From Swiss-Prot:
Annotated tr-type G domain residues: 10-204
Family annotation (PROSITE patterns): G_TR_1 (PS00301), G_TR_2 (PS51722)
Record InterPro entries: EF-Tu_GTP-bd (IPR041709), EF-Tu_GTPase (IPR050055), EFTu-like_2 (IPR004161), EFTU_2 (IPR033720), G_TR_CS (IPR031157), P-loop_NTPase (IPR027417), Small_GTP-bd (IPR005225), T_Tr_GTP-bd_dom (IPR000795)
Protein name: Elongation factor Tu
Quaternary structure note: Monomer.
Amino acid sequence: MSKEKFERTKPHVNVGTIGHVDHGKTTLTAAITTVLAKHFGGAARAFDQIDNAPEEKARGITINTSHVEYDTETRHYAHVDCPGHADYVKNMITGAAQMDGAILVVAATDGPMPQTREHILLGRQVGVPYIIVFLNKCDMVDDEELLELVEMEVRELLSQYDFPGDDTPIVRGSALQALNGVPEWEEKIIELAQHLDSYIPEPERAIDKPFLLPIEDVFSISGRGTVVTGRVERGIIKSGEEVEIVGIKETTKTTVTGVEMFRKLLDEGRAGENVGALLRGTKREEIERGQVLAKPGTITPHTDFESEVYVLSKEEGGRHTPFFKGYRPQFYFRTTDVTGTIELPEGVEMVMPGDNIKMTVSLIHPIAMDEGLRFAIREGGRTVGAGVVAKIIK
């Protein structure tokens, strides 16, 4: 069969496997690629190809992640699988692999285990919007009642963390048997793929979201006014549109009178492009790096929030010593550092390098933020942690 050219016509969706160690996440990943390659074309990936995950760096943090891709009838999927629990924690917190939905793998022989719970909690904290459950190793359980019990436990656990436990699709399967080509278990992989297609909605593309541009630089051009530059994070900006300048100071409104790229005037700037935006009647000293330009009413400035944080280990270039409550590092959002203080959960006295922890942060200046915004924690310009805004307080 000749190689077909890659069709970009199908919607692209990012997913990943999560769940307890040895419950079969990597075997399932291999089974999905193998079974779907048979049915819809594409490349099958062997277990050891996936398990031997290459190291990547995201925000200075080393993460082992395997990336595979596969097709269903209607979609193209990019799928991440991590070998170790620590890699999952880092991946989810840094957003290195943003997931539109996750496949939670639970071994029917064990039921939910500590990391099952932790991955669901992390999913909730970092904003994984949809979870589908694959109940694995069902070939090793003869007792229908036991399967029903495990299923009930998983649904309760999901509901506990505000996922719709009662409505979550659960597929009973055996990744190993499917990988070995046993037809009845291959069917279960097809069933899982159908749930991926129907249960996870098509993600909104960055370009369709409301306009946002983090300001990197501000210039004053004589006779023309003030220009801010940066990379458009989402949406589209057209000349003549009104925008808000949000963060650090009081929110103000202005009009974009021109958009340029490489000194050429454009009709519009789009998500992913580095542009300069000329602002009407705004003085150079009224704007600074760290603020954002945004479509009016779409983002607000905040100082206090709950976050989920991963603290770099000494080996990753992080701190060599723990920190305690009252710790005052810099929090790096988009383009700028803001000093903040932290509060630790009740009963937690200190945080060790290599830990992940829920902490409440209070910044000295407000920053334009939404839940799900990623940040780095820095001391004197060196990254010592990575986090995500889980819940805005004020």
